[in-house]
Amino acid sequence: LLGEVASCSDRIACRERPGEGLRFSLLRNGEPTGISFRAVPTGHEFSSLLLAVLNADGQGKNFPDRSVCDRVRALNGPIRLTTYVSLTCTNCPDVVQALNAMATLNPGVEHETVDGAIHQAEVAALNVQGVPSVFADGELLHVGRGDFGELLAKLEARYGIDAAGIEAVERRFDVVVLGGGPAGV
């Protein structure tokens, strides 16, 4: 699968090295991106692999607005995230893609996606009951559907932030609706 993905562009390469089990990591210019898979990301997770490659190259389109990206960059690390997925899960890609984007934005965040069907003994040892299940440094952080903001809030609560890394956002409004009538609903 990785060879086929690499054959799509002369800017992508696939190198093999000896190791235990099925695992691959994404590198950019030879440097780790913080994104790895212990899975064959087919099915719903194929888009997660492609977006991770695009995000690592700066071409991704699934990043949130600048203020949210600044919050991700301000997370105190190191943070080691592991997400257990099923390749048939329709909620898993949203969580995987959000956490991969966070790993791209903050070098202190590492995210590994694990196919629970391949690593059943690990799933049983951790008592994973549903997918996606996100573990932060070995402790359960989140289970089930989740969006970028929800996952970021949980990471901020657990690891804290460096407030100096966040710029204050001033919002100006042209119109303010006051009252509880039909226009205020």
Predicted regions and their residues:
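Catalytic cores of nucleotide-enabled group-transfer and carboxylate-activating enzymes in metabolic
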Residues: P78, G108, E112, A117-I118, ...
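Beta1/beta-strand and adjacent pyrophosphate-binding region of the FAD-binding site
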Residues: I166-A183
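Non-catalytic, surface beta->alpha helical segment in thiol-disulfide oxidoreductase systems
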Residues: L27-G60, F135-G165
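Structural micro-motif
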Residues: R17-I35, Q120-D137
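Local sequence-structure signature of Cys/Sec-based thiol-disulfide redox active-site neighborhoods
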Residues: L1-G3, V72-T113
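Short glycine/serine/threonine-rich phosphate/pyrophosphate-binding segments
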Residues: P93-D94, P182-V185
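Thiol-based oxidoreductase modules, predominantly thioredoxin-like and allied folds used
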Residues: S9-G19, P107-A121
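Extracytoplasmic thiol/disulfide redox context detector
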Residues: L1, A6-C14, E45-R80, E110, ...
